[in-house]
Amino acid sequence: MIPKLKYLLSLAILGIPVALLAAEDPNLPKAEETEYYSPVPPIITANEGQAPSDAVVLFDGTNLNAWEPVKAGSKGWEIVDKALTVIPKSGYMKTKAAFGDMQLHIEFREPKPIGDKKGQSRGNSGIFMMGLYELQVLDSYNNTTYVNGQAGSIYKQHPPLVNACRPPEVWQTYDVIFIAPRFASDGSLISPARETVLHNGVLIQYDVVLKGPTEYRGYPKYKAHAAKLPIQLQDHGDRVAYRNIWVREITLPQSK
């Protein structure tokens, strides 16, 4: 046996961590040289079931002050039992504020199926990051459709890793990390949008690369747009409800 390997095995048998040898190696830098103390991460409060203290609360069940209808002349959606509820044919709703890189928490509830509706006709809605990139909302509980259009899909681009849907009329959650695309001054794409999604606490999308804004027909293609744009919620004709909506703007860390 090689002498050094025999020595290390002897240390392991004696219960002496091999990592301690690093502290005895004069050729390695001091431990302090690989430690830094700034910038200090800000302290936030993150209590169970509540929005973090640095979050922007978009809907808490009491008012629609953070929202407005997209369609001109529309009265928008309504609040029913503290839930923001779609009024069919009223059009999309959008946030008054604009967002780019963000962490989004949103809860939704699918309505009870009516008649023999199936596929895309059951509880259809959507959450559009920047008003352009759709995370599908659909009743996909015992309801089949094309996989890149089921609940949790990045619509027509990425199917979810798993189907984590709950039955209709039961509240569900999406937790989203969205990184906006970057464009050069000439409008060319520097980096595409990326997205990670947890559905009811289960990872269903992991840092997927978006091919461009959502398209129902045709293929997605990037076109330069603002660094921040409003979030939109889709009216697709079904009485989908939303609650507890908050967002945290993200500042990406700079590598050391």
Each predicted region: which residue ranges?
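N-terminal signal peptide c-region/cleavage motif recognized by signal peptidases
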Residues: 17-18
